[in-house]
UniProtKB/Swiss-Prot annotation:
It comes from Mesorhizobium japonicum (strain LMG 29417 / CECT 9101 / MAFF 303099). This is DNA mismatch repair protein MutL. GO terms for biological process: mismatch repair. SMART domains: DNA_mis_repair (SM01340), MutL_C (SM00853). This protein is involved in the repair of mismatches in DNA. It is required for dam-dependent methyl-directed DNA mismatch repair. May act as a 'molecular matchmaker', a protein that promotes the formation of a stable complex between two or more DNA-binding proteins in an ATP-dependent manner without itself being part of a final effector complex. The gene is mutL. NCBIfam families: mutl, PRK00095.2-4. SUPFAM superfamilies: ATPase domain of HSP90 chaperone/DNA topoisomerase II/histidine kinase, DNA mismatch repair protein MutL, Ribosomal protein S5 domain 2-like.
Length: 627
Protein backbone atom coordinates (compact mmCIF):
# COMPACT_ATOMS: atom_id res chain seq x y z
CA UNK A 1 0.00 0.00 0.00
CA UNK A 2 1.50 3.38 -0.97
CA UNK A 3 2.11 6.13 1.57
CA UNK A 4 -0.77 8.60 1.62
CA UNK A 5 -2.15 11.43 3.72
CA UNK A 6 -4.82 10.33 6.22
CA UNK A 7 -8.17 12.07 6.15
CA UNK A 8 -8.98 14.66 8.81
CA UNK A 9 -11.68 12.38 10.24
CA UNK A 10 -9.25 9.46 10.55
CA UNK A 11 -6.65 11.72 12.21
CA UNK A 12 -9.22 12.89 14.75
CA UNK A 13 -10.36 9.33 15.47
CA UNK A 14 -6.76 8.32 16.12
CA UNK A 15 -6.41 11.28 18.48
CA UNK A 16 -9.68 10.29 20.14
CA UNK A 17 -8.20 6.87 20.86
CA UNK A 18 -5.53 8.59 22.93
CA UNK A 19 -7.65 11.26 24.60
CA UNK A 20 -11.15 9.72 24.85
CA UNK A 21 -10.80 6.39 26.61
CA UNK A 22 -14.29 6.26 28.16
CA UNK A 23 -17.21 8.62 28.98
CA UNK A 24 -15.35 9.92 32.03
CA UNK A 25 -12.60 11.16 29.68
CA UNK A 26 -15.15 13.25 27.79
CA UNK A 27 -16.47 14.73 31.03
CA UNK A 28 -12.94 15.59 32.13
CA UNK A 29 -12.14 17.46 28.91
CA UNK A 30 -15.43 19.36 28.85
CA UNK A 31 -15.32 20.34 32.54
CA UNK A 32 -11.73 21.55 32.14
CA UNK A 33 -12.83 23.69 29.18
CA UNK A 34 -15.59 25.19 31.33
CA UNK A 35 -13.15 26.06 34.12
CA UNK A 36 -10.67 27.58 31.66
CA UNK A 37 -13.57 29.79 30.49
CA UNK A 38 -13.93 31.19 34.02
CA UNK A 39 -17.11 29.33 35.00
CA UNK A 40 -18.47 29.67 38.54
CA UNK A 41 -21.08 26.96 37.95
CA UNK A 42 -20.66 23.64 36.12
CA UNK A 43 -23.53 21.21 35.60
CA UNK A 44 -23.00 17.68 34.24
CA UNK A 45 -25.83 15.38 33.11
CA UNK A 46 -25.27 11.82 31.86
CA UNK A 47 -27.43 8.97 30.60
CA UNK A 48 -26.48 5.36 30.00
CA UNK A 49 -23.26 5.82 31.94
CA UNK A 50 -22.35 8.63 29.53
CA UNK A 51 -22.54 6.50 26.38
CA UNK A 52 -26.03 7.76 25.48
CA UNK A 53 -25.68 11.35 26.68
CA UNK A 54 -23.20 13.72 28.27
CA UNK A 55 -24.23 17.35 28.73
CA UNK A 56 -21.94 19.91 30.36
CA UNK A 57 -23.31 23.41 30.99
CA UNK A 58 -21.32 26.35 32.38
CA UNK A 59 -21.71 30.09 32.92
CA UNK A 60 -18.26 30.97 31.62
CA UNK A 61 -17.22 33.55 29.06
CA UNK A 62 -18.75 31.70 26.11
CA UNK A 63 -17.52 31.37 22.51
CA UNK A 64 -18.20 34.15 19.97
CA UNK A 65 -20.19 32.96 16.97
CA UNK A 66 -17.34 33.58 14.46
CA UNK A 67 -15.06 31.32 16.53
CA UNK A 68 -17.40 28.33 16.84
CA UNK A 69 -16.03 26.71 13.69
CA UNK A 70 -12.48 27.17 14.97
CA UNK A 71 -13.42 25.63 18.33
CA UNK A 72 -14.04 22.27 16.66
CA UNK A 73 -11.00 22.47 14.36
CA UNK A 74 -7.94 20.49 15.33
CA UNK A 75 -5.13 22.34 17.11
CA UNK A 76 -7.10 25.57 17.48
CA UNK A 77 -7.07 27.04 20.98
CA UNK A 78 -7.23 30.34 22.85
CA UNK A 79 -5.11 29.05 25.73
CA UNK A 80 -1.65 28.85 24.23
CA UNK A 81 0.29 31.40 22.21
CA UNK A 82 4.00 30.69 21.72
CA UNK A 83 5.58 29.38 24.94
CA UNK A 84 4.85 25.68 25.55
CA UNK A 85 6.78 25.96 28.83
CA UNK A 86 4.37 28.49 30.32
CA UNK A 87 1.08 26.57 30.48
CA UNK A 88 -1.31 27.96 33.08
CA UNK A 89 -4.61 26.51 31.82
CA UNK A 90 -6.01 23.00 32.19
CA UNK A 91 -6.32 22.50 28.45
CA UNK A 92 -3.98 23.68 25.71
CA UNK A 93 -3.78 21.10 22.91
CA UNK A 94 -6.93 22.04 20.97
CA UNK A 95 -7.64 18.34 20.39
CA UNK A 96 -10.54 17.49 22.69
CA UNK A 97 -13.58 18.85 20.80
CA UNK A 98 -12.61 17.61 17.31
CA UNK A 99 -11.62 14.24 18.78
CA UNK A 100 -14.94 13.88 20.61
CA UNK A 101 -16.86 15.01 17.53
CA UNK A 102 -15.15 12.37 15.39
CA UNK A 103 -16.59 9.48 17.46
CA UNK A 104 -19.97 10.90 18.55
CA UNK A 105 -22.77 13.34 17.77
CA UNK A 106 -21.53 16.60 19.28
CA UNK A 107 -23.26 19.96 19.57
CA UNK A 108 -21.96 23.21 21.08
CA UNK A 109 -24.34 26.02 22.03
CA UNK A 110 -22.73 29.20 23.36
CA UNK A 111 -23.34 32.86 24.09
CA UNK A 112 -20.94 35.55 25.27
CA UNK A 113 -21.78 38.33 27.73
CA UNK A 114 -21.89 40.88 24.88
CA UNK A 115 -23.70 38.65 22.41
CA UNK A 116 -27.29 39.45 21.45
CA UNK A 117 -28.08 35.78 20.95
CA UNK A 118 -26.53 32.34 21.12
CA UNK A 119 -25.23 30.21 18.27
CA UNK A 120 -24.85 26.45 17.83
CA UNK A 121 -22.61 24.16 15.79
CA UNK A 122 -22.58 20.38 15.52
CA UNK A 123 -20.42 17.46 14.39
CA UNK A 124 -21.60 13.94 13.63
CA UNK A 125 -18.88 11.34 13.31
CA UNK A 126 -16.46 13.95 12.02
CA UNK A 127 -18.90 15.65 9.64
CA UNK A 128 -19.24 19.35 10.53
CA UNK A 129 -22.74 20.84 10.48
CA UNK A 130 -23.36 24.54 9.72
CA UNK A 131 -23.58 27.18 12.44
CA UNK A 132 -27.16 28.14 13.29
CA UNK A 133 -28.89 30.55 15.72
CA UNK A 134 -29.95 29.21 19.13
CA UNK A 135 -31.42 30.35 22.44
CA UNK A 136 -29.24 30.18 25.55
CA UNK A 137 -28.03 32.14 28.54
CA UNK A 138 -24.46 33.35 28.84
CA UNK A 139 -22.04 30.46 28.85
CA UNK A 140 -21.65 27.22 26.93
CA UNK A 141 -23.51 23.92 26.73
CA UNK A 142 -21.73 20.98 25.11
CA UNK A 143 -23.87 17.93 24.39
CA UNK A 144 -22.40 14.57 23.39
CA UNK A 145 -24.74 11.81 22.22
CA UNK A 146 -24.10 8.24 21.09
CA UNK A 147 -20.46 8.17 22.15
CA UNK A 148 -18.33 5.82 20.00
CA UNK A 149 -21.14 5.24 17.48
CA UNK A 150 -18.57 5.98 14.75
CA UNK A 151 -16.06 3.51 16.24
CA UNK A 152 -18.27 0.65 17.49
CA UNK A 153 -15.29 -1.57 18.27
CA UNK A 154 -14.50 0.74 21.21
CA UNK A 155 -17.89 -0.07 22.79
CA UNK A 156 -16.73 -3.63 23.44
CA UNK A 157 -14.22 -2.28 25.95
CA UNK A 158 -16.74 -0.29 27.97
CA UNK A 159 -17.79 -1.50 31.41
CA UNK A 160 -21.33 -1.51 32.76
CA UNK A 161 -23.39 1.62 33.25
CA UNK A 162 -22.73 1.70 36.99
CA UNK A 163 -18.95 1.43 36.55
CA UNK A 164 -18.87 4.17 33.91
CA UNK A 165 -21.06 6.42 36.08
CA UNK A 166 -18.74 5.83 39.03
CA UNK A 167 -15.71 6.79 36.92
CA UNK A 168 -17.47 9.99 35.84
CA UNK A 169 -18.32 10.85 39.44
CA UNK A 170 -14.68 10.33 40.44
CA UNK A 171 -13.52 12.69 37.68
CA UNK A 172 -15.91 15.44 38.77
CA UNK A 173 -14.92 15.04 42.44
CA UNK A 174 -11.23 15.06 41.60
CA UNK A 175 -11.55 18.30 39.63
CA UNK A 176 -13.94 19.91 42.13
CA UNK A 177 -11.45 19.62 45.00
CA UNK A 178 -9.07 21.98 43.16
CA UNK A 179 -11.81 24.57 42.48
CA UNK A 180 -13.72 25.14 45.74
CA UNK A 181 -15.19 28.47 44.54
CA UNK A 182 -17.05 26.72 41.70
CA UNK A 183 -20.41 25.00 42.17
CA UNK A 184 -20.55 21.51 40.65
CA UNK A 185 -23.58 19.30 40.06
CA UNK A 186 -23.71 15.84 38.49
CA UNK A 187 -26.94 14.03 37.61
CA UNK A 188 -27.09 10.53 36.15
CA UNK A 189 -29.82 8.42 34.61
CA UNK A 190 -29.79 6.24 37.73
CA UNK A 191 -31.12 9.27 39.65
CA UNK A 192 -27.81 9.68 41.45
CA UNK A 193 -26.96 13.30 42.07
CA UNK A 194 -23.77 14.92 43.26
CA UNK A 195 -24.08 18.49 44.51
CA UNK A 196 -21.04 20.43 45.64
CA UNK A 197 -21.96 24.00 46.67
CA UNK A 198 -19.34 26.68 46.10
CA UNK A 199 -17.21 27.72 49.08
CA UNK A 200 -14.20 30.01 48.55
CA UNK A 201 -10.50 29.81 47.77
CA UNK A 202 -9.32 30.29 51.36
CA UNK A 203 -7.70 27.36 53.22
CA UNK A 204 -10.90 26.99 55.24
CA UNK A 205 -13.02 27.01 52.09
CA UNK A 206 -10.75 24.48 50.45
CA UNK A 207 -11.08 22.18 53.47
CA UNK A 208 -14.87 22.50 53.35
CA UNK A 209 -14.81 21.40 49.71
CA UNK A 210 -12.59 18.46 50.67
CA UNK A 211 -15.12 17.49 53.33
CA UNK A 212 -17.92 17.69 50.75
CA UNK A 213 -16.08 15.21 48.55
CA UNK A 214 -14.36 12.93 51.06
CA UNK A 215 -16.76 13.01 53.99
CA UNK A 216 -17.07 15.02 57.17
CA UNK A 217 -14.78 12.62 59.07
CA UNK A 218 -11.70 13.49 57.02
CA UNK A 219 -11.00 17.00 58.40
CA UNK A 220 -11.17 15.68 61.98
CA UNK A 221 -8.75 12.87 61.14
CA UNK A 222 -6.27 14.76 58.99
CA UNK A 223 -3.16 16.89 59.39
CA UNK A 224 -2.50 20.12 57.50
CA UNK A 225 0.57 20.25 55.25
CA UNK A 226 2.34 23.49 54.34
CA UNK A 227 5.97 23.37 53.24
CA UNK A 228 8.21 25.01 50.66
CA UNK A 229 11.58 24.09 49.21
CA UNK A 230 13.46 25.85 46.41
CA UNK A 231 10.36 27.51 44.99
CA UNK A 232 8.12 24.42 45.18
CA UNK A 233 5.16 24.94 47.54
CA UNK A 234 3.28 21.95 49.00
CA UNK A 235 -0.06 22.36 50.79
CA UNK A 236 -2.99 20.12 51.61
CA UNK A 237 -4.05 17.52 54.16
CA UNK A 238 -3.09 13.91 54.92
CA UNK A 239 -4.91 11.48 57.16
CA UNK A 240 -3.48 10.34 60.45
CA UNK A 241 -2.21 6.76 60.11
CA UNK A 242 -5.13 5.08 61.89
CA UNK A 243 -7.52 6.66 59.36
CA UNK A 244 -6.33 4.58 56.41
CA UNK A 245 -7.95 2.75 53.51
CA UNK A 246 -7.52 -0.60 51.74
CA UNK A 247 -6.72 1.13 48.42
CA UNK A 248 -5.24 4.37 47.15
CA UNK A 249 -8.41 5.67 45.46
CA UNK A 250 -8.68 8.50 47.99
CA UNK A 251 -5.25 9.91 47.27
CA UNK A 252 -5.71 13.17 45.35
CA UNK A 253 -2.74 15.08 43.93
CA UNK A 254 -2.66 18.36 42.01
CA UNK A 255 0.12 20.18 40.19
CA UNK A 256 -0.67 23.86 39.63
CA UNK A 257 -4.35 23.04 40.06
CA UNK A 258 -4.27 20.17 37.57
CA UNK A 259 -5.43 16.73 38.85
CA UNK A 260 -2.68 14.17 38.20
CA UNK A 261 -2.02 10.50 38.87
CA UNK A 262 1.73 10.64 39.15
CA UNK A 263 3.87 7.66 40.16
CA UNK A 264 6.49 9.87 41.79
CA UNK A 265 3.92 11.56 44.04
CA UNK A 266 2.25 8.23 44.88
CA UNK A 267 5.64 6.72 45.73
CA UNK A 268 6.54 9.69 47.92
CA UNK A 269 3.28 9.33 49.86
CA UNK A 270 3.90 5.63 50.33
CA UNK A 271 7.45 6.30 51.48
CA UNK A 272 6.34 8.98 53.95
CA UNK A 273 3.88 6.58 55.59
CA UNK A 274 6.16 3.52 55.41
CA UNK A 275 6.92 3.71 59.14
CA UNK A 276 3.30 3.89 60.24
CA UNK A 277 1.27 1.90 57.69
CA UNK A 278 1.67 -1.65 56.35
CA UNK A 279 1.95 -2.04 52.59
CA UNK A 280 -1.70 -3.12 52.25
CA UNK A 281 -3.02 0.09 53.83
CA UNK A 282 -3.08 3.51 52.18
CA UNK A 283 -3.29 7.03 53.56
CA UNK A 284 -6.04 9.43 52.52
CA UNK A 285 -4.41 12.52 51.04
CA UNK A 286 -5.16 15.78 49.25
CA UNK A 287 -1.92 17.44 48.15
CA UNK A 288 -1.38 20.58 46.07
CA UNK A 289 1.98 21.32 44.46
CA UNK A 290 2.47 24.87 43.22
CA UNK A 291 5.59 25.61 41.20
CA UNK A 292 6.89 27.50 38.19
CA UNK A 293 5.29 25.99 35.04
CA UNK A 294 8.73 26.05 33.43
CA UNK A 295 10.04 23.31 35.76
CA UNK A 296 7.21 20.84 35.18
CA UNK A 297 6.22 19.30 31.85
CA UNK A 298 2.47 18.69 31.56
CA UNK A 299 2.75 17.84 27.85
CA UNK A 300 3.82 14.25 28.53
CA UNK A 301 0.56 12.38 27.91
CA UNK A 302 -2.40 13.25 25.65
CA UNK A 303 -4.82 13.00 28.58
CA UNK A 304 -2.51 15.25 30.68
CA UNK A 305 -2.78 12.86 33.65
CA UNK A 306 1.00 12.42 33.92
CA UNK A 307 3.59 15.11 34.48
CA UNK A 308 7.37 15.19 34.51
CA UNK A 309 9.35 17.28 36.99
CA UNK A 310 12.69 18.81 36.11
CA UNK A 311 13.98 17.85 39.58
CA UNK A 312 12.05 14.76 40.75
CA UNK A 313 14.32 14.28 43.76
CA UNK A 314 13.40 17.75 45.04
CA UNK A 315 9.66 17.05 44.72
CA UNK A 316 9.87 13.62 46.33
CA UNK A 317 12.04 14.93 49.16
CA UNK A 318 9.64 17.81 49.81
CA UNK A 319 6.60 15.50 49.99
CA UNK A 320 8.26 12.86 52.16
CA UNK A 321 9.83 15.40 54.50
CA UNK A 322 6.69 17.52 54.88
CA UNK A 323 4.43 14.55 55.61
CA UNK A 324 6.84 12.98 58.09
CA UNK A 325 7.27 16.30 59.88
CA UNK A 326 3.50 16.76 60.03
CA UNK A 327 3.05 13.24 61.44
CA UNK A 328 5.70 13.97 64.06
CA UNK A 329 4.06 17.28 64.98
CA UNK A 330 0.70 15.51 65.30
CA UNK A 331 2.10 13.56 68.24
CA UNK A 332 -0.13 10.74 69.45
CA UNK A 333 -3.35 11.61 67.62
CA UNK A 334 -5.55 8.62 66.84
CA UNK A 335 -8.56 8.36 64.53
CA UNK A 336 -11.88 9.55 65.95
CA UNK A 337 -13.65 6.79 64.02
CA UNK A 338 -12.53 4.24 66.61
CA UNK A 339 -14.41 6.00 69.39
CA UNK A 340 -17.41 6.55 67.11
CA UNK A 341 -17.49 2.86 66.32
CA UNK A 342 -17.32 1.91 69.97
CA UNK A 343 -20.20 4.24 70.79
CA UNK A 344 -22.20 2.76 67.92
CA UNK A 345 -21.53 -0.76 69.19
CA UNK A 346 -23.10 0.10 72.55
CA UNK A 347 -26.39 1.12 70.96
CA UNK A 348 -29.06 -1.59 70.86
CA UNK A 349 -29.13 -3.48 67.57
CA UNK A 350 -25.94 -1.87 66.30
CA UNK A 351 -23.81 -3.88 63.92
CA UNK A 352 -20.16 -4.51 64.66
CA UNK A 353 -17.94 -1.67 63.54
CA UNK A 354 -14.64 -1.68 61.70
CA UNK A 355 -12.72 1.52 62.38
CA UNK A 356 -10.99 1.38 59.02
CA UNK A 357 -7.92 -0.50 60.14
CA UNK A 358 -6.35 -3.43 58.30
CA UNK A 359 -8.76 -5.65 56.44
CA UNK A 360 -8.27 -8.70 58.64
CA UNK A 361 -8.98 -6.66 61.72
CA UNK A 362 -7.52 -6.92 65.18
CA UNK A 363 -7.75 -10.68 65.60
CA UNK A 364 -5.26 -11.52 62.85
CA UNK A 365 -2.61 -9.29 64.46
CA UNK A 366 -3.52 -10.53 67.92
CA UNK A 367 -3.01 -14.11 66.79
CA UNK A 368 0.26 -13.14 65.14
CA UNK A 369 1.80 -11.49 68.15
CA UNK A 370 0.52 -14.17 70.55
CA UNK A 371 2.18 -16.81 68.37
CA UNK A 372 5.34 -14.89 67.48
CA UNK A 373 8.59 -14.72 69.37
CA UNK A 374 8.69 -16.25 72.81
CA UNK A 375 5.00 -17.09 73.24
CA UNK A 376 4.27 -14.06 75.36
CA UNK A 377 4.85 -13.32 79.05
CA UNK A 378 3.45 -15.69 81.63
CA UNK A 379 2.43 -13.75 84.72
CA UNK A 380 2.83 -16.86 86.84
CA UNK A 381 6.43 -17.35 85.73
CA UNK A 382 7.34 -13.68 85.54
CA UNK A 383 5.19 -11.81 88.06
CA UNK A 384 5.21 -8.03 87.80
CA UNK A 385 8.43 -7.97 85.78
CA UNK A 386 9.26 -4.30 85.09
CA UNK A 387 9.22 -2.84 81.61
CA UNK A 388 12.78 -1.54 81.50
CA UNK A 389 13.84 -4.06 78.86
CA UNK A 390 16.77 -3.30 76.59
CA UNK A 391 16.91 -4.09 72.90
CA UNK A 392 19.97 -4.02 70.72
CA UNK A 393 22.89 -5.77 69.18
CA UNK A 394 21.89 -5.42 65.56
CA UNK A 395 25.14 -7.18 64.68
CA UNK A 396 23.71 -10.39 66.16
CA UNK A 397 20.50 -9.96 64.17
CA UNK A 398 21.81 -11.73 61.09
CA UNK A 399 19.35 -14.58 60.84
CA UNK A 400 17.58 -15.21 57.56
CA UNK A 401 14.83 -12.70 58.34
CA UNK A 402 16.87 -10.58 60.71
CA UNK A 403 17.28 -12.45 64.00
CA UNK A 404 16.49 -10.98 67.40
CA UNK A 405 19.09 -10.18 70.00
CA UNK A 406 19.03 -11.10 73.63
CA UNK A 407 18.16 -8.32 76.06
CA UNK A 408 21.10 -6.41 77.39
CA UNK A 409 23.62 -6.93 74.57
CA UNK A 410 24.23 -3.37 73.69
CA UNK A 411 25.93 -2.78 70.36
CA UNK A 412 22.85 -0.73 69.49
CA UNK A 413 21.38 -0.43 72.95
CA UNK A 414 18.43 1.94 73.01
CA UNK A 415 18.30 2.03 76.78
CA UNK A 416 15.33 1.27 79.00
CA UNK A 417 12.09 1.54 77.07
CA UNK A 418 10.54 3.09 80.15
CA UNK A 419 13.23 5.23 81.68
CA UNK A 420 13.55 6.33 85.26
CA UNK A 421 12.55 9.85 84.24
CA UNK A 422 9.34 8.53 82.74
CA UNK A 423 8.35 6.59 85.88
CA UNK A 424 5.65 8.02 88.05
CA UNK A 425 7.00 9.15 91.37
CA UNK A 426 5.19 9.15 94.66
CA UNK A 427 4.95 12.93 94.58
CA UNK A 428 3.08 13.00 91.23
CA UNK A 429 -0.55 13.31 92.20
CA UNK A 430 -3.51 11.75 90.44
CA UNK A 431 -4.86 15.23 89.78
CA UNK A 432 -1.71 16.06 87.81
CA UNK A 433 -2.03 12.90 85.73
CA UNK A 434 -5.66 13.62 84.94
CA UNK A 435 -4.51 16.73 83.10
CA UNK A 436 -2.25 14.81 80.72
CA UNK A 437 -3.26 13.67 77.24
CA UNK A 438 -3.68 10.00 78.16
CA UNK A 439 -4.50 10.53 81.82
CA UNK A 440 -3.96 8.32 84.86
CA UNK A 441 -4.06 4.53 84.61
CA UNK A 442 -6.99 3.08 86.55
CA UNK A 443 -6.98 -0.60 85.62
CA UNK A 444 -5.76 -3.31 83.29
CA UNK A 445 -8.43 -5.53 81.71
CA UNK A 446 -7.97 -8.85 79.91
CA UNK A 447 -4.26 -8.49 80.63
CA UNK A 448 -3.87 -6.39 77.47
CA UNK A 449 -5.87 -3.17 77.76
CA UNK A 450 -5.01 -0.26 80.02
CA UNK A 451 -7.98 1.82 81.15
CA UNK A 452 -7.03 5.42 81.96
CA UNK A 453 -8.96 8.51 83.01
CA UNK A 454 -8.51 12.15 82.04
CA UNK A 455 -10.54 15.09 83.31
CA UNK A 456 -13.15 14.72 80.57
CA UNK A 457 -12.69 11.29 78.98
CA UNK A 458 -11.97 7.59 79.31
CA UNK A 459 -8.93 6.23 77.45
CA UNK A 460 -8.41 2.58 76.51
CA UNK A 461 -4.86 1.63 75.45
CA UNK A 462 -3.72 -1.54 73.68
CA UNK A 463 -0.55 -2.20 75.66
CA UNK A 464 1.09 -4.44 73.06
CA UNK A 465 0.37 -2.11 70.14
CA UNK A 466 1.54 0.93 72.11
CA UNK A 467 4.74 -0.66 73.38
CA UNK A 468 5.49 -2.07 69.92
CA UNK A 469 5.48 1.47 68.52
CA UNK A 470 7.70 2.74 71.35
CA UNK A 471 10.22 -0.07 70.82
CA UNK A 472 10.21 0.49 67.06
CA UNK A 473 10.86 4.23 67.39
CA UNK A 474 13.72 3.57 69.80
CA UNK A 475 15.26 0.95 67.51
CA UNK A 476 14.85 3.17 64.46
CA UNK A 477 16.42 6.18 66.16
CA UNK A 478 19.36 4.06 67.23
CA UNK A 479 19.63 2.60 63.74
CA UNK A 480 19.85 5.99 62.01
CA UNK A 481 21.87 7.87 64.60
CA UNK A 482 25.12 6.15 63.65
CA UNK A 483 26.52 4.01 60.81
CA UNK A 484 24.72 0.70 60.41
CA UNK A 485 26.87 -2.34 61.35
CA UNK A 486 27.95 -4.29 58.28
CA UNK A 487 29.22 -7.78 57.56
CA UNK A 488 32.15 -8.43 55.22
CA UNK A 489 31.43 -10.84 52.38
CA UNK A 490 33.87 -13.73 52.06
CA UNK A 491 34.07 -13.04 48.33
CA UNK A 492 32.96 -9.73 46.82
CA UNK A 493 29.76 -9.94 44.78
CA UNK A 494 30.42 -8.65 41.25
CA UNK A 495 27.29 -7.27 39.59
CA UNK A 496 27.07 -6.32 35.93
CA UNK A 497 24.92 -3.25 35.28
CA UNK A 498 24.37 -0.67 32.57
CA UNK A 499 27.18 1.85 32.78
CA UNK A 500 24.84 4.68 33.82
CA UNK A 501 23.45 2.59 36.73
CA UNK A 502 26.94 1.66 37.90
CA UNK A 503 27.97 5.32 37.82
CA UNK A 504 24.90 6.38 39.82
CA UNK A 505 25.61 3.76 42.49
CA UNK A 506 29.22 4.91 42.72
CA UNK A 507 28.06 8.51 43.20
CA UNK A 508 25.91 7.39 46.16
CA UNK A 509 28.52 5.04 47.65
CA UNK A 510 29.10 7.18 50.76
CA UNK A 511 25.39 7.26 51.58
CA UNK A 512 25.12 3.51 50.99
CA UNK A 513 28.12 2.92 53.26
CA UNK A 514 26.31 4.64 56.15
CA UNK A 515 23.56 2.05 55.70
CA UNK A 516 26.08 -0.79 55.81
CA UNK A 517 26.40 -1.45 52.07
CA UNK A 518 30.01 -1.29 50.86
CA UNK A 519 30.01 -0.80 47.09
CA UNK A 520 32.65 0.34 44.59
CA UNK A 521 33.27 0.41 40.84
CA UNK A 522 34.69 -2.76 39.28
CA UNK A 523 35.56 -1.82 35.75
CA UNK A 524 33.18 -0.70 33.00
CA UNK A 525 29.53 -1.53 33.64
CA UNK A 526 30.08 -3.35 36.93
CA UNK A 527 30.20 -2.80 40.70
CA UNK A 528 31.65 -4.88 43.51
CA UNK A 529 29.74 -5.31 46.77
CA UNK A 530 32.12 -6.05 49.67
CA UNK A 531 29.86 -5.44 52.69
CA UNK A 532 26.14 -5.75 53.42
CA UNK A 533 24.11 -4.62 56.45
CA UNK A 534 24.28 -7.19 59.26
CA UNK A 535 20.55 -6.81 59.86
CA UNK A 536 19.73 -8.18 56.41
CA UNK A 537 21.41 -11.50 57.12
CA UNK A 538 21.39 -13.71 54.04
CA UNK A 539 19.98 -11.48 51.33
CA UNK A 540 19.85 -11.44 47.55
CA UNK A 541 22.61 -8.90 46.99
CA UNK A 542 22.13 -8.79 43.22
CA UNK A 543 18.43 -7.95 43.52
CA UNK A 544 19.06 -5.39 46.27
CA UNK A 545 21.65 -3.53 44.19
CA UNK A 546 19.48 -3.58 41.06
CA UNK A 547 16.51 -2.24 43.05
CA UNK A 548 18.70 0.54 44.42
CA UNK A 549 19.96 1.39 40.93
CA UNK A 550 16.38 1.63 39.66
CA UNK A 551 15.33 3.85 42.56
CA UNK A 552 18.30 6.17 42.15
CA UNK A 553 17.48 6.47 38.44
CA UNK A 554 13.84 7.30 39.19
CA UNK A 555 14.09 9.41 42.34
CA UNK A 556 17.78 10.06 43.06
CA UNK A 557 17.37 8.44 46.52
CA UNK A 558 18.38 5.22 48.30
CA UNK A 559 15.14 4.74 50.23
CA UNK A 560 14.89 1.04 49.28
CA UNK A 561 17.75 0.06 51.60
CA UNK A 562 16.51 2.28 54.42
CA UNK A 563 13.00 0.83 54.12
CA UNK A 564 14.34 -2.72 54.30
CA UNK A 565 16.25 -1.93 57.47
CA UNK A 566 13.24 -0.17 58.99
CA UNK A 567 11.07 -3.19 58.18
CA UNK A 568 13.42 -5.47 60.11
CA UNK A 569 13.40 -3.01 63.02
CA UNK A 570 9.58 -3.15 62.97
CA UNK A 571 9.64 -6.96 63.10
CA UNK A 572 12.11 -6.85 65.98
CA UNK A 573 9.86 -4.38 67.79
CA UNK A 574 6.87 -6.69 67.40
CA UNK A 575 8.81 -9.56 68.97
CA UNK A 576 10.46 -7.39 71.60
CA UNK A 577 7.44 -5.55 72.95
CA UNK A 578 5.32 -6.43 75.94
CA UNK A 579 2.82 -9.15 75.05
CA UNK A 580 -0.85 -9.61 75.57
CA UNK A 581 -1.33 -11.45 78.84
CA UNK A 582 1.34 -9.48 80.68
CA UNK A 583 0.24 -8.10 84.05
CA UNK A 584 1.48 -4.56 84.72
CA UNK A 585 1.86 -2.56 87.87
CA UNK A 586 0.14 0.82 88.13
CA UNK A 587 3.46 2.65 87.82
CA UNK A 588 4.34 0.62 84.73
CA UNK A 589 1.03 1.47 83.10
CA UNK A 590 1.45 5.16 83.87
CA UNK A 591 5.05 5.08 82.65
CA UNK A 592 3.89 3.56 79.37
CA UNK A 593 1.28 6.31 78.98
CA UNK A 594 3.85 9.03 79.65
CA UNK A 595 6.27 7.63 77.11
CA UNK A 596 3.48 7.40 74.53
CA UNK A 597 2.82 11.11 75.09
CA UNK A 598 6.51 11.85 74.50
CA UNK A 599 6.83 9.75 71.33
CA UNK A 600 5.59 11.16 67.98
CA UNK A 601 3.46 8.71 66.05
CA UNK A 602 2.60 6.56 69.05
CA UNK A 603 -1.12 6.92 68.34
CA UNK A 604 -0.70 4.19 65.72
CA UNK A 605 1.06 0.83 65.89
CA UNK A 606 3.35 -0.52 63.18
CA UNK A 607 0.39 -2.24 61.49
CA UNK A 608 -1.68 0.93 61.13
CA UNK A 609 -4.06 0.19 64.01
CA UNK A 610 -4.80 2.78 66.69
CA UNK A 611 -2.95 2.23 69.95
CA UNK A 612 -5.68 3.90 71.99
CA UNK A 613 -9.31 5.00 71.82
CA UNK A 614 -10.67 7.99 73.72
CA UNK A 615 -14.32 8.17 74.81
CA UNK A 616 -15.48 11.61 75.84
CA UNK A 617 -17.38 11.79 79.12
CA UNK A 618 -20.22 13.63 77.38
CA UNK A 619 -20.68 10.72 74.96
CA UNK A 620 -20.67 8.19 77.79
CA UNK A 621 -23.30 10.21 79.63
CA UNK A 622 -25.47 10.22 76.50
CA UNK A 623 -25.38 6.43 76.46
CA UNK A 624 -26.90 6.40 79.93
CA UNK A 625 -29.46 9.08 79.12
CA UNK A 626 -27.82 11.74 81.29
CA UNK A 627 -27.65 14.18 78.36
Amino acid sequence: MPIRQLSETMINQIAAGEVIERPASVVKELVENALDAGASRVEVVTAGGGLNLIRVTDDGSGIPEPELALAIARHCTSKLAEDINDIRSLGFRGEALPSIGSVSRLSIRSRTALGDSAAEIGIEGGRVLPVRPAAANRGTTVEVRDLFFATPARLKFMKGERAESSATSDVVKRIAIAFPAVRFTLAGSDRSTLELPATDDSPEGSLRRVAQVMGAEFPDNSIAIDAMREGVHLTGHVSIPSFSRANALQQYAYVNGRPVRDKLIAGAIRGAFADVLPRDRHAVTVLFLTLDPAIVDVNVHPAKADVRFRDPGLVRGLIVGAIRQALADAGIRSATTGAAGMMAAFRPGAASYNHGGPANGHRSYEAAYRASGSAGFDPARSPQRPLDMQFGDFERAGARHGGFSEPGQAAFDTGPLVSADARVGQNETTETLLGTVLGAARAQVHENYIVAQTRDSLVIVDQHAAHERLVYEALKNALHSRPVPSQMLLLPEIIDLPEEDAERLAMHSETLARFGLGIERFGPGAVAVRETPSMLGETNVQQLVRDLADEIADNDTVETLKERLDKIAATMACHGSVRSGRLLKAEEMNALLRQMEATPGSGTCNHGRPTYIELKLADIERLFGRR
